[in-house]
A protein has these predicted regions:
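Structural signature of beta-strand start/N-cap positions in the alpha/beta core
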Residues: 32, 60, 109-111, 135
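Conserved alpha/beta-hydrolase "nucleophile elbow" surrounding the catalytic nucleophile
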Residues: 114-116
Length: 176
């Protein structure tokens, strides 16, 4: 994968750093696919999948790590995200990233490719900004919160706190 770049994005009155990479075609006239990672994901965890897909589809791609993931600005230790965190990512962070990268979604409507949390964020963005989206490709999005999901998050948290999962994630996330 390529070297990450960083964009400064204004979010909730704070300047945050967003890690991103351009992949696939370098031709800006080609369709754009934006990749939105899952709940423990980041730019690095996608590996070369976005690049390979964009080459096969003759598209350019934007892969980024949401705030609190990868090499983007870490979440404050005492910060607890509310249940609307995916809405905030879709309605606040993603449009701010597009502005920071000079992506005019009215002129070039991106395709959104999201996995899990990223799939939910893609669907939320596309529902609100229908006129600014070519379409969505989603894998295992969360349409509603299920008890099994809440239990799985609690189990993952315990695993993170009691095993070497923190060390394994550290190579993908600056604040693991």
């Amino acid at each position: 994968m390529q070297t990450s770049q960083f964009a400064s994005v204004d979010w909730r009155g704070n300047a945050i750093r967003i890690e991103y990479q351009w992949v696939g075609s370098a031709d800006i006239s080609k369709p754009l696919i934006v990749f939105l990672h899952e709940g423990l994901g980041s730019v690095a965890m996608w590996r070369d999948f976005p690049h390979q897909l964009c080459i096969a589809a003759n598209c350019r791609g934007l892969v980024y790590s949401r705030p609190g993931y990868g090499k983007s600005s870490p979440r404050k230790r005492d910060e607890h995200w509310q249940v609307d965190f995916m809405h905030r990512q879709a309605f606040e962070v993603l449009p701010s990233l597009f502005r920071a990268l000079n992506i005019d979604t009215e002129k070039q409507k991106p395709w959104l490719f999201g996995h899990s949390d990223g799939g939910s964020i893609a669907l939320l963005f596309a529902a609100k900004y229908v006129q600014d989206t070519s379409g969505c490709i989603v894998l295992a999005p969360h349409i509603f919160v299920e008890d099994v999901t809440v239990r799985s998050i609690e189990k993952a948290k315990l695993t993170y706190e009691t095993t070497d999962l923190r060390q394994k994630l550290a190579r993908f996330h600056d604040d693991a």
